[in-house]
Design a protein with these regions (language model features):
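N-terminal "arm"/small-domain region of PLP-dependent enzymes with the aminotransferase-like
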Residues: 1-12, 22, 26-94
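Active-site phosphate-binding strand-loop segment of PLP-dependent enzymes
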Residues: 73, 173, 177-231
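Conserved N-terminal alpha-helix of the aminotransferase class I/II PLP-enzyme fold
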Residues: 85-132
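Conserved PLP-anchoring active-site segment centered on the Schiff-base-forming lysine
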Residues: 140-159
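Active-site PLP attachment segment
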Residues: 243, 249-285
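Amphipathic alpha-helix from the class-I
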Residues: 302-321, 332-336
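Conserved PLP-binding catalytic core of the aspartate aminotransferase-like
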Residues: 324-328, 335-350
Length: 350
């Protein structure tokens, strides 16, 4: 008997009520607990996110030693000694939180330093920090885009980008994943109706498949039709490009005109938070109109300070190159054993 649970974000209840879906889910989970699949969150880690971890299996009530292959801490930065020590020092000096929103009392010297550092490695003018990469994507799209605009997404764009689109009220269409011809067709067909009003959105590195967006071609077509390009660098920063500088660096793209980048500090950087980095004019505008930033408490100074230390390690060592070598080694071994790892170009293995 199958006990597969519907874990999509589009549940409806049998009776159409608000709480009905909650009760339906409870019934499904009661059946699911009887199976051995047990995909629901049940196994907390008892140790730091390292190569080897100890987890507690609540189903068996046993501690389990495991090798970590499921983390998104690509560089192992969650346990960098330099970052840990800096976080401790800054916590003692500044406390455990920022104490305010960015436009009032929440901006620390470490936040400003981190914003400048991200802009520098990304080749942009300035940066805004957010509480997560998710809220950064919500903020940039809902802040810039209005219902009279059009957003064109890659079919496999991250959920946060789609949610930001819904919040903006703009029309959305999607091109076939990685299909440059389909993207150009949509731009050609729609640009007369939306002069200077189209945003093209893509992940830099796609989080599920591990492939890299064809940015040179996407950028050429986007500029041909006077559109703006938004690239989500969540799985690219610290992973690809020179010293982990991301997708634009990976392709050697130096002209940043009409490009906006978003990203996260919670993956390769190993802390928590997100960012938008772009031209000065765009950043100045979004500091006021990105509501997910303006109405959220700023990141703790200790988090910003730790992220700075991680980026310094990225920029001064060969750790990103070592990540690439390790990923290629594992992928080659898996392929030699007959595993299909699809078309991944990064450490992500589908």
């Amino acid at each position: 008997m199958s006990y597969i649970v519907n874990l999509t974000g589009n549940r409806t209840s049998k009776d159409g009520s608000i709480m009905g879906k909650v009760h339906d889910f409870k019934e499904e989970m009661a059946l699911h607990e009887q199976s051995e699949l047990n995909v629901y969150r049940k196994h907390p880690q008892l140790t730091a996110c390292d190569r080897r971890v100890t987890v507690y299996n609540r189903h068996t009530q046993q501690k389990v030693q495991a090798i970590m292959f499921g983390s998104n801490s690509y560089l192992g930065a969650t346990i960098f000694p330099e970052a840990i020590q800096k976080a401790i020092e800054v916590t003692k000096e500044f406390g455990i939180g920022s104490g305010g929103v960015p436009l009032l009392t929440g901006t620390s010297i470490y936040q400003e330093e981190l914003e400048k550092l991200i802009a520098k490695i990304s080749g942009m003018d300035d940066t805004i920090l957010f509480s997560s990469g998710y809220t950064a994507n919500l903020g940039v799209i809902s802040g810039l885009i209005r219902p009279n605009n059009l957003i064109i997404h890659d079919k496999l764009d991250h959920a946060s980008l789609l949610d930001g689109t819904v919040m903006s009220g703009a029309k959305m269409i999607r091109y076939k994943h990685g299909d440059i011809n389909d993207l150009e067709r949509l731009l050609k067909d729609n640009s007369p109706q939306y002069p200077n009003g189209i945003l093209v959105v893509t992940d830099g590195v796609f989080s599920m498949d591990g492939d890299i967006a064809k940015l040179p071609q996407i950028l050429e077509i986007t500029r041909k039709y006077d559109a703006i390009l938004l690239v989500d660098e969540a799985h690219a920063i610290g992973v690809i490009g020179d010293k982990g500088a991301g997708t634009l660096s990976h392709y050697g793209i130096t002209d940043r005109k009409n490009i906006i980048l978003t990203g996260t500090l919670s993956k390769a950087i190993g802390t928590v938070g997100g960012y938008i980095t772009a031209s000065q004019d765009v950043i100045d505008y979004l500091r006021i109109y990105a509501r997910s930033n303006m109405f959220s408490t700023s990141l703790p100074p200790s988090v910003c300070a730790a992220a700075i230390e991680v980026i310094k390690v990225m920029q001064s060592t060969e750790i990103v190159e070592h990540l690439k070598q390790n990923a290629e080694y594992l992928q080659n071994k898996l392929k030699s054993e007959g595993f299909n790892i699809m078309n991944t170009e990064t450490p992500i293995i589908p």
